[in-house]
Amino acid sequence: MLSLAKIAALFVLTAVAEIVGCYLPWLVLKAGKPAWLLAPAALSLALFAWLLTLHPAAAARTYAAYGGVYIAVALAWLRIVDGVPLSRWDVAGAALALAGMSVIALQPRG
């Protein structure tokens, strides 16, 4: 069984792989970047799909819990990579999403 810290790190890594896999095609299509960026984008999305299989919970529960982490990581990406300041609404929304994710992920098993 994975520890809580390892599961959290796996969720974050999974989110980064998905975001990179979607951000690179966006750069090609919207920002005029070179088409070769589509190759690492495809690899990143394949990594994302594989990482989802490493999560210890049932697939649907993993996807539901992952959504909260994805929101938080996407907002971190917005701030760090895109340089867009976060609003208090962004932070509040991420906190709510992470709270919901915690309810799903940390429920009693048995």
From Swiss-Prot:
Instruction: Kindly give the InterPro entries that the UniProt entry links to this protein.
Output: UPF0060
Q: How does it sit in the membrane?
A: Multi-pass membrane protein
User: Where does it localize?
Assistant: Cell inner membrane
Main site of residence? membrane
The protein's UniProt keywords, in alphabetical order, are:
Cell inner membrane, Cell membrane, Membrane, Transmembrane, Transmembrane helix
Identify the domain of life.
Answer: Bacteria
GO CC terms on record?
A: plasma membrane
Record has Cell inner membrane as a keyword: yes
Transmembrane spans:
9-29, 34-54, 64-84, 86-106
Which cysteine pairs make disulfide bonds? none
The record's listing under PANTHER family reads:
UPF0060 MEMBRANE PROTEIN YNFA
Stated family: Belongs to the UPF0060 family.
| Entry protein name | UPF0060 membrane protein BMA0761
